[in-house]
């Protein structure tokens, strides 16, 4: 028998981060997503000015430190499942979860950054 996990909110925050040369505003959309296990989820992030590929995506769960998922816009951090992917350059970026899993219900952040590990 198939079991449905109740839809939960993937909280997305509108965040503002300082850039290396001047202040760059990062805006995520949508502000929240109602989704179920197995869904394809797409989150977009727009920079107020071009940042090339200097964009990272983080996942944060309550009481935990943020976890780096994607760096340099599209590079998957070691150990992160391949269902996560990133794309974009310049001002428009996307994080995609190809098939949402129960452990993916969390808050996701984009961040402009001028260096990556």
Curated annotation (Swiss-Prot):
Region (Complementarity-determining-2) residue spans: 72-78
- Which is a Pfam family this sequence falls into? V-set
Write out the ranges of the annotated region (Framework-3).
79-110
Protein location: Secreted; Cell membrane
InterPro entries in the record, alphabetically? Ig-like_dom (IPR007110), Ig-like_dom_sf (IPR036179), Ig-like_fold (IPR013783), Ig_sub (IPR003599), Ig_V-set (IPR013106), IgV_Light_Chain (IPR050150)
Region of interest (Framework-2), ranges: 57-71
Q: Which GO terms describe its molecular function?
A: antigen binding
User: Which superkingdom heads the taxonomic lineage of this protein's source?
Assistant: Eukaryota
Q: Where is this region: Framework-1?
A: 23-45
**Complementarity-determining-3: annotated span:** 111-117
Instruction: Offer one example of a GO biological process linked to this entry.
Output: adaptive immune response
**Chain residue ranges for the region called Complementarity-determining-1:** 46-56
| Record keywords, A-Z | Adaptive immunity, Cell membrane, Disulfide bond, Immunity, Immunoglobulin, Immunoglobulin domain, Membrane, Secreted, Signal
Q: A cellular component term (GO) from this record?
A: plasma membrane
Signal sequence, start to end: 1-22
Q: Which parts of the sequence belong to the Ig-like domain?
A: 24-117
For this chain, the annotated S-S bridges are 45-110
Q: What does this protein do?
A: V region of the variable domain of immunoglobulin light chains that participates in the antigen recognition. Immunoglobulins, also known as antibodies, are membrane-bound or secreted glycoproteins produced by B lymphocytes. In the recognition phase of humoral immunity, the membrane-bound immunoglobulins serve as receptors which, upon binding of a specific antigen, trigger the clonal expansion and differentiation of B lymphocytes into immunoglobulins-secreting plasma cells.
The UniProt subunit note reads as follows: Immunoglobulins are composed of two identical heavy chains and two identical light chains; disulfide-linked.
Protein name from the UniProt record: Immunoglobulin kappa variable 1D-12
């Amino acid at each position: 028998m198939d079991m449905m996990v109740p839809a939960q909110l993937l909280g997305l925050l509108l965040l503002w981060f300082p850039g290396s040369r001047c202040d760059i505003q990062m805006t995520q959309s949508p502000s929240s997503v109602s989704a179920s296990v197995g869904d394809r989820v797409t989150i977009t992030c727009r920079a107020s000015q071009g940042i090339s590929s200097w964009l990272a995506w983080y996942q944060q769960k309550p009481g935990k430190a943020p976890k780096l998922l994607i760096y340099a816009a599209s590079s998957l951090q070691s150990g992160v499942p391949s269902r996560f992917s990133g794309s974009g350059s310049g001002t428009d970026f996307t994080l995609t979860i190809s098939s949402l899993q129960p452990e993916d219900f969390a808050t996701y952040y984009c961040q402009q950054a001028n260096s990556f590990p």
